[in-house]
Amino acid sequence: MEIASRIAGASSYTRAMGVNLPELTLEIFSGSDIDFVLPNDYTVEQDRALYNAYDSNISFSKVYMDYDDTVTCRGKLNDQIIQFIAKCKNHKIPVILLSRHDGDLNTELSNWGITGLFDKVVHMDRKKPKSDFISDKNSIFIDDSFGERKQVKEAVGIPTFEPSMVEFLINRRGF
């Protein structure tokens, strides 16, 4: 027989409505007088799906990434990339932006409010390969361009990722 304190997975629905059942339970057990809850006034439909989690022996101490079609895509910030950058920040892993962006890259970063996310911004000329700017062998490279990833992989020998592959990097156990 198993005895354990736990909450039902479906209680996430009530949290989405603004009612935190575990918190209410703690309040009741601490002697608080709870005679009402404060649900929010909107509709919520819950869809429960599988969540991918990965185990891997990959290790890196620096991230190099592209800007166009990687950090931004179709006129919007790539929220998965931004989430990955935030996780890197939490783990003190520097993120270096390597870009051949047409126009004023610093202004564009400022307009998106993401200037401070990068430890270094390299606005490159189109003639130099990105691998020329990658000095740390214990790093990874993220770019939407297969050609860029291939060139970096061959020149530097580090793991390379297409932007949609960051799900793997975000959902690694222990990261």
Task: State the predicted function of each range.
Residues 95, 139, 158-160:
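Hydrophobic anchor at the start of a short beta-strand
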Residues 41-125:
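Alpha-helical substrate-recognition element adjacent to the catalytic core
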Residues 129-147, 152:
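Conserved Lys-Pro-Asp/Glu-containing loop-to-beta segment of HAD-superfamily phosphomonoesterases
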Residues 1-9:
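Conserved metal-phosphate-binding beta-hairpin within the catalytic cores
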Residues 122-128, 146-147, 163-170:
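Short, acidic/turn-prone active-site loops that include or flank metal/cofactor-
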Residues 154-175:
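Acidic, PIN/NYN-like endoribonuclease modules and their adjacent C-terminal/linker elements
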Residues 114-117, 137, 154-157:
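Short, structured coil segments at secondary-structure junctions
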Residues 11-53:
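Active-site "cap" helix and flanking loop/linker of ATP-utilizing ligase/carboxylase catalytic domains
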